[in-house]
């Protein structure tokens, strides 16, 4: 996919471009879940600074006007940049089709847009289990069925990663099945339920499609934060399943000891 000197406006995160001259390109990440979440229209200032002219996160709509003027670009600028991305059906809708070929084709289409706009990692698909009907992000996830979940995540991954230099990020590993207090909640789950329900989808997707990245969840599992779990991140994910990509955290969840021991990339996104 070539060197990325430019961060796609609206991208969720980017690594340094200071090593490009040494042959190490920077990495650009874009959120999902329904295709790439990028700024559709951005303004480019005379100094080359690029800002989206519309909020791409809903809460920004409610910020005071002076704050928005600082954060957002000028829609009347003579130098505007356009990025048109496709709004694909969300996970629960795709899974309702029971059509794995369709899911792979959707992934391939997302990958083509990633390549066009210089995005390396798509922070999707989300594949947590539909355990609680009140979970505010169930629409992103595929199903209450771990087999269906794993198969659809694998199909989308295969589609995206057909495109050179484009990768998915399976999330949120694992047991992140509610949004309420998800930063602190403790999922108490026995080994059989953990293996057969909450890990099974991730296992299928990792083994069948070899994703480029996995995002760890905020919550604890049986009293230990997933970010600090050698068992879940190394023994299970890497040693048992053979995962060899990046493990990244959710927004600002990485502690000092986690960086030292388990994580290869600190990720500040959701």
Annotate each PLM feature.
Residues 1-270:
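Glycoside hydrolase catalytic-domain context in secreted enzymes
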């Amino acid at each position: 996919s070539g060197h990325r000197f430019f961060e796609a406006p609206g991208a969720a995160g980017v690594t340094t471009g200071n090593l490009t001259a040494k042959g190490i390109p920077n990495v650009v990440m874009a959120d999902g879940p329904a295709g790439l979440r990028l700024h559709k229209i951005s303004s480019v200032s005379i100094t080359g600074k690029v800002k989206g002219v519309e909020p791409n996160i809903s809460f920004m709509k409610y910020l005071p006007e002076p704050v928005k003027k600082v954060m957002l670009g000028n829609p009347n600028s003579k130098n505007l940049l356009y990025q048109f991305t496709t709004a694909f059906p969300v996970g629960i809708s795709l899974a309702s089709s029971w059509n794995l070929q369709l899911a792979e084709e959707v992934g391939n289409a997302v990958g083509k847009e990633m390549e066009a706009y210089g995005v390396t990692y798509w922070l999707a698909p989300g594949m947590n289990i539909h355990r609680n009907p009140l979970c505010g992000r169930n629409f992103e996830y595929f199903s209450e069925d771990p087999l269906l979940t794993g198969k659809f995540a694998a199909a989308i991954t295969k589609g995206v990663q057909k495109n050179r230099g484009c990768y998915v990020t399976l999330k949120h590993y694992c047991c992140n099945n509610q949004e309420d207090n998800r930063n602190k909640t403790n999922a108490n789950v026995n080994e059989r339920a953990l293996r057969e329900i909450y890990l099974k989808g991730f296992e299928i997707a990792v083994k069948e499609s070899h994703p480029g990245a996995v995002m760890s969840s905020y919550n604890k599992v049986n009293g230990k934060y997933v970010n600090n779990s050698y068992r879940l991140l190394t023994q299970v994910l890497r040693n048992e399943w053979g995962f060899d990509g990046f493990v990244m955290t959710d927004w600002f969840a990485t502690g000092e000891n986690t960086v030292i021991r388990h994580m290869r990339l600190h990720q500040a996104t959701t």
